[in-house]
Structures are given as C-alpha cells and as structure tokens.
C-alpha cells in the first residue's frame, strides 16, 4: 500500500491506499474534502503535490503545464508512490 498524506486547512490526514485505488475513495471517509463532478472535469477538488506521483490520466480539466506545476485533481488521482498533497487549491488557478 502507498501512504497518502493530505495537508488540509484543518490539519494533516494520513492513510493507506492500495495500488490502483483512487485516493478519494478512502479520503472522503476521513476528511471533508471539496468535491463536485468526481470525474476530473472541474477544479473543485484541486490539490498540489508536495512529493510523490499519481496517475490522473482520467482527468480532462488540467493542461500539461498545470500538471507539471504539481496540480492534481484529487477526485481521480491514483497514487503511484507514497504521496503528500496540499488540498483546497482551487483558488490558485
């Protein structure tokens, strides 16, 4: 399993995600995260990767440059390593 740490305005939340599992499926049980479409087509759930990698190829909202800057659509992100993500970043776009 991969260790996921979400840095939220209310503090850090850490949990494990199995390979191939969307982090939101676990995170939504542990934190009050902003969600809307849950399909990677909007920016409500936007976060920024501090460390680690995710697969967010299902998403359509972010362009390559935004992804290179570390932005991540947490609703569709599948961790590919241990990962640390800052949540609640929609206002930055």
UniProtKB/Swiss-Prot annotation:
Cofactor annotation comment: Binds 1 [2Fe-2S] cluster.
Binding-site positions, [2Fe-2S] cluster: 37, 42, 45, 75
Cellular component annotations (GO), alphabetically ordered: chloroplast
Pfam families, per the entry: Fer2
PROSITE patterns documented for this protein: 2FE2S_FER_1, 2FE2S_FER_2
Subcellular location: Plastid, Chloroplast
Cofactors required: [2Fe-2S] cluster
Gene Ontology biological-process annotations: electron transport chain
Record-annotated 2Fe-2S ferredoxin-type domain positions: 2-91
The entry's keywords: 2Fe-2S, Chloroplast, Electron transport, Iron, Iron-sulfur, Metal-binding, Plastid, Transport
GO molecular function, one term: metal ion binding
Gene3D superfamilies for the chain: 3.10.20.30
CDD domains reported for this sequence: fer2
Protein family according to the UniProt entry: Belongs to the 2Fe2S plant-type ferredoxin family.
Free-text function comment from the UniProt entry: Ferredoxins are iron-sulfur proteins that transfer electrons in a wide variety of metabolic reactions.
UniProt protein name: Ferredoxin-2
Organism: Equisetum telmateia (Great horsetail)
């Amino acid at each position: 399993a991969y260790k996921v740490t979400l840095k939220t305005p209310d503090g850090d939340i850490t949990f494990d995600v199995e390979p191939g599992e969307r982090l939101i499926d676990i995170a939504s049980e542990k934190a009050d995260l902003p969600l809307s479409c849950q399909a990677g087509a909007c920016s409500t759930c936007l976060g920024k990767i501090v460390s680690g990698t995710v697969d967010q190829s299902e998403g359509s909202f972010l362009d390559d440059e935004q992804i290179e800057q570390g932005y991540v659509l947490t609703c569709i992100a599948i961790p590919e390593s241990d990962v640390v993500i800052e949540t609640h970043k929609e206002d930055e776009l």
